[in-house]
């Protein structure tokens, strides 16, 4: 059973890496130039700070998941002897997985909120609607946000697996005592 959980976790991590890289590529390569009143105007992800932040967050999250995938493949071939050190590593993985899930989800929500302002505009602040002028730009950002939320769901399942791997080491009868 443990080997199948490791394989499932590796497959989910690989899928997460693909979705995060796809999100970062869709955001990073997104720009559109239009001629408006004989002036060329360019819409880019750099114009929206939330998209720049999401680009950095998804890139770091993909690197973290790649590192965890390499570490789990290494630890599958090497079995440690200390149960206590394995518990510390399980706690570290659990906390880092939780932090990465929250960071990616928060980055996606911030980018979604910023994208809604770009989509609808705001007259009080004199922010214009972009999506009626830059349709491909907005469509590509929408696709990247969809990929980002799918990656968040996949990372939530990874965090659930790491929680299972952590808490199954503890005794059900004695509080915070490792099983022997």
UniProtKB/Swiss-Prot annotation:
Transmembrane segments: 8-28, 50-70, 99-119, 141-161
UniProt superkingdom: Eukaryota
Membrane topology: Multi-pass membrane protein
Segments in the Extracellular topological domain: 29-49, 120-140
Signal sequence, renumbered to the chain: none
Subcellular location: Cell membrane
InterPro entries, per the entry: CASP/CASPL (IPR006459), CASP_dom (IPR006702)
Statement: the UniProt record of this protein carries the keyword Cell membrane: yes
Entry annotated with the keyword Kinase: no
Any one cellular-component term (Gene Ontology): plasma membrane
Cytoplasmic-facing ranges: 1-7, 71-98, 162-180
Keywords: Cell membrane, Membrane, Transmembrane, Transmembrane helix
The protein's assembly and partners: Homodimer and heterodimers.
Family statement drawn from the similarity comment of this UniProt entry: Belongs to the Casparian strip membrane proteins (CASP) family.
Protein name: CASP-like protein XL3
Organism of derivation: Gossypium hirsutum
């Amino acid at each position: 059973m443990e080997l199948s959980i490791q394989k499932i976790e590796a497959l989910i991590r690989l899928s997460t890496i693909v979705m995060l890289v796809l999100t970062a590529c869709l955001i990073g390569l997104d720009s559109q130039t239009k001629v408006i009143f004989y002036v060329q105007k360019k819409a880019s992800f750099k114009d929206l700070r939330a998209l720049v932040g999401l680009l950095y967050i998804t890139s770091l999250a993909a690197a973290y998941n790649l590192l965890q995938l390499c570490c789990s493949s290494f630890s599958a071939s090497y079995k440690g002897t200390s149960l206590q050190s394995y518990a510390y590593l399980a706690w570290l993985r659990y906390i880092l997985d939780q932090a990465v899930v929250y960071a990616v989800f928060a980055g996606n929500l911030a980018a979604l909120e910023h994208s809604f302002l770009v989509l609808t505009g705001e007259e009080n602040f004199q922010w214009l609607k972009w999506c009626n002028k830059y349709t491909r730009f907005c469509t590509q950002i929408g696709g990247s946000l969809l990929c980002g939320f799918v990656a968040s769901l996949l990372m939530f399942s990874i965090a659930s697996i790491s929680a299972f791997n952590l808490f199954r080491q503890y005794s059900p009868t004695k509080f915070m005592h490792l099983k022997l």
